[in-house]
Regions:
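Short, low-complexity disordered leader/linker segments with a strong preference
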Residues: 1-32, 390-394
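Immediate post-signal peptide segment of exported/extracytoplasmic ligand-binding proteins
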Residues: 21-35, 63-69, 161-166
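Extracytoplasmic "Venus flytrap"
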Residues: 27, 31-53, 75-82, 104-105, ...
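Beta-alpha junction/loop-to-helix N-cap segments that form part of ligand/metal-binding clefts
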Residues: 30, 45-50, 60, 64-133, ...
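Solvent-exposed, acidic/polar segments of extracytosolic/periplasmic ligand-binding ectodomains
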Residues: 31, 335-394
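Periplasmic-binding protein-like
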Residues: 35, 91, 95-104, 124-126, ...
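Extracellular/periplasmic Venus flytrap/periplasmic-binding protein
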Residues: 86, 131-134, 139-240, 275-286
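Extracellular/periplasmic periplasmic-binding protein-like sensory domains
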Residues: 234-307, 318-324, 367, 373-394
Length: 394
């Protein structure tokens, strides 16, 4: 009988040991992240801000995400959808990443959505947030730490409407985010749109468009020209003598990614954002100080949204205790968004896009000679995008 008890005890001990080994095998000691952004060409400054912001989050977390060593693999999508698709497939198939962070541009997002998410990998966008993926094409494995593309532009549309602008000239690049931008402005601006111009992505010479603006004599212009496009347009707009005659409204055209090149040409111009470097909370103060120390530049929305993407992933991994094998549990943890965002109040809507505040910001020159956008007025509070109602997720 004693032998039987001894055998049973041994088997029980073996079973416990086997279970412990299985648990160790399920819980890795590192997490692989694929970061894909635009790091070449005129828009590269946007990708650099995203990369820097995400890297700073990992550094603040001691090189770990959710207690797991963070292995961050970085790729340049070259602003080419086919290149992006190939690199995302390599992330998933070869590198077996658990999360993909990116991209900058909406045309790249549209290209990579299926290969990035169809096998259970989670895609976290620190910038691009198209209307289709917020609505009817929403995806359970896709989360956005930025905004729905229309929203920042709606800030300027509401401001223009409320401040008495009668005639506006609109311009944006000819791709989905550009169309979302102008539609967002028009959602709130009900005055006369004297012209609506779409230019090629990465256009740098605006002499023809500036002539159209001068001839149209609008009260205000509204433009969405990110990266190098915005740098050139702002300088050319100022040089053409239009800045003293026409109110300059924009989104992602005068921000911390472009101001080091635009400098005084952008002072006094308006933008619409979900955050600014002078937002008064302790986490923003630390982030801005540490970012400037590490990278020698003022962080903008691209950097902060990537930083929050890092905090989001960290919070999710912690909630599942490092076990990334249960995709449903990881998804639920991501949706909970249990972290302190740089923007303050933050939660996901049913479509995995944020509900958040938005501000009118104005370009200023700091006493130390650096340029930044500063909050002029809160326009929307706890603002949800209008496309969530079309998303099947609840």
């Amino acid at each position: 009988m004693n032998k039987l008890f001894a055998m049973a005890a041994a088997l029980a001990a073996f079973g416990f040991a086997a279970t412990a080994v299985e648990a160790q095998e399920k819980t890795p000691d590192k997490v692989k992240i694929g970061l894909i952004v635009t790091l070449s060409g005129p828009p590269a400054v946007l990708g650099h801000q995203i990369r820097n912001g995400f890297e700073l989050a990992v550094a603040h977390l001691g090189g770990k995400l959710g207690g797991l060593e963070a292995d961050v693999l970085v790729q340049d999508d070259e602003l080419k959808p086919d290149v992006a698709v190939n690199k995302v497939k390599a992330f998933v198939d070869r590198d077996q990443v658990s999360f993909i962070v990116g991209p900058v541009f909406s045309n790249i997002l549209q290209a990579i959505m299926k290969p990035a998410t169809e096998n259970g990998t989670f895609l976290i966008s620190p910038n691009a947030g198209t209307s289709s993926f917020a609505g009817k094409d929403c995806n359970a494995n896709f989360f956005v730490t930025s905004y729905q593309n229309n929203q920042a532009h709606e800030v300027l549309g509401k401001y223009a409407q409320d401040s008495g602008v009668k005639k506006a000239f609109l311009m944006a690049p000819n791709y989905q985010a550009g169309k979302d931008a102008l539609n967002g402005f028009k959602n709130y601006f009900k005055g006369d749109v004297v012209d609506e111009v779409y230019v090629p992505l990465n256009q740098l010479d605006y002499s023809a468009e500036l002539s159209k603006i001068a001839d149209a004599k609008p009260d205000a212009i509204f433009v969405f020209l990110p990266g190098g496009m915005g740098v050139n347009f702002v300088k050319q707009f100022r040089q053409a003598g239009l800045a003293d005659k026409i109110t300059f409204l924009s989104a992602f055209t005068v921000d911390e990614s472009t101001l080091p090149a635009q400098q005084d040409a952008a002072i006094g111009f308006f933008g619409g954002q979900n955050w600014a470097p002078n937002l008064d909370n302790p986490q923003t103060k630390k982030f801005v100080a540490d970012y400037e120390k590490a990278y020698g530049a003022v962080p903008g929305t691209y950097a902060f949204q990537a930083y929050d993407a890092g905090l989001l992933i960290d919070s999710a991994i912690r909630q599942v205790h490092g076990d990334l094998s249960d995709k449903d549990a990881v998804r639920a943890a991501l949706k909970k968004a249990d972290f302190t965002s740089l923007r303050g109040a933050f939660k996901f809507n049913t479509n995995h896009y944020p509900i958040q505040d938005f501000y009118l910001v104005k370009v200023a020159k700091r006493p130390d000679g650096k340029y930044e956008t500063e909050i002029a007025k809160k326009i929307f509070e706890n603002y949800a995008d209008p496309y969530a109602k079309d998303c099947a997720m609840k």
